[in-house]
């Protein structure tokens, strides 16, 4: 458990899932010769089915503060587990984190939430939305929409959003290329000094 940084361990009897044990309870066991099934530990009966949606898995991790979620088939046979690292990698792929591009965060009214209109604005600038998600806030009528765009140069898209009265809350470009503007600026300054 320590090697993989796991704080929970699924307990199984062949393929039968018995429950989820916490690291704390397992560490309290003094006799290392006793089988885990014979230890006086309380087991969580938490699991997810193999066809569950990722949101269900995220909910279990969040609500129960788990480091792993056991995965069972429809006959409740143990198939494996999802670790927090697996979940993070899957979520990174889901939100196109590793794809090049920029991020635009919009603040909008919850009554004016039209993803199709936002998509039209982005596509009118010859770009595509790679991923999007919406955050809501308690006691607020505002939503925060985060758009991952397949371009790093976002000024035209931002101008279009502002033209349609969208509030641009933040812009993040993960551009690693140099467009040569610093070289041109330095050349211009050298020219002026001559």
Segments from the language model and where they lie:
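N-terminal, positively charged regions that mediate nucleic acid binding
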Residues: 1-5
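Bateman/CBS regulatory modules and CBS-like beta-alpha motifs in cytosolic regions of diverse proteins
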Residues: 6, 11-13, 17-21, 31-60, ...
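Histidine- and aromatic-rich ligand-binding microenvironments
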Residues: 10, 25-26, 86-87, 157-159, ...
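Short secondary-structure transition/capping segments
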Residues: 21-24, 35-36, 81-82, 93, ...
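Short, structured interface segments
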Residues: 26-30, 75, 79-94
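A conserved regulatory-domain signal marking ACT and ACT-like small-molecule sensing domains
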Residues: 91, 101-194
